[in-house]
Amino acid sequence: MEIKENLFKSDRHNSFYLSSGPEEGELIIMTHGWPELSLSWRHQLKFLGELGYHVVAPDMRGYGRSSVYKDHEAYSQREINLDMVELFTSLGKKEAIWIGHDWGSPVVWNMALHHPDKVKAVCSLCVPLGFGEHPENLMNTVNREIYPVEEYPAGQWDYQFHYYENFDDAQKEMDEDPYKLVKILFRKGDPMGLGLPAGTSLTRKNKGWFAEFGGIPDFPIDEEMISEEEARTFAKYLTENTFFGPNSWYVNGEDNQKFNETINDQTLEMPALFVHATYDYVCDTTS
């Protein structure tokens, strides 16, 4: 199954996207998370395209070959929602099945909430409906048996507060070596971590993600998850674009909340699927 490269341009934003399958097929749009690319959906693009769907996976704003912006506000869900509406409209279909992972999940939930007429069904991997706002709103999801409040006041979400309080330091730490960071992040979950605090619960105490190690550790690639060539591709665009855009998705909580307050009825009438990842300890939302 051929995967095609495409570029949609509007007056306000450029969206690079990968596509597969017949253009007359039922449309599926898949949105990636932090810090990824449309390439993250390479296996699903081939599989779903072979089933006869027209499958589209964009580089989200701030990533890859889509538009990159220099102010935090450009990465609000309000702006990202407009990107998706424009891209969807350009594809000439009445509705689509929307699938999102990680930060791509609030994107598809918001399409379902704000534009239900454009959503035949919605699916989210790892992030439930209602996330994407300020991390203060996530405290009710912290399992205090794992994260005693005295030691871990923000639980697994501590790293999100780090972006608000030390954005420049967080970006500098990641920009140091995106290739090493990709090798750390793109790997299977470890069953041995079940029931233990996630490392992200101590980000502020440790003054960053990797300060205690003296920089980003050099881990071997998890070849069951990603190839050397793919890791280099992710690192290439993260190096060119920097982590300013990807990390800015985390610091628009107030505006994201206001955006969703504009909706009168937040009941989804279309089919919806949420898939929780048992070994994703950072995004543990099942407490």
Task: Map each language-model feature to its residues.
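Flexible "cap/lid" subdomain of the alpha/beta-hydrolase fold that forms the substrate-access gate
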Residues: 2, 14-15, 27, 63-99, ...
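Short glycine-aromatic motifs
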Residues: 2-3, 53
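Conserved HGGG/HGGXW glycine-rich cap/lid loop of the alpha/beta-hydrolase fold
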Residues: 19-68, 87, 101
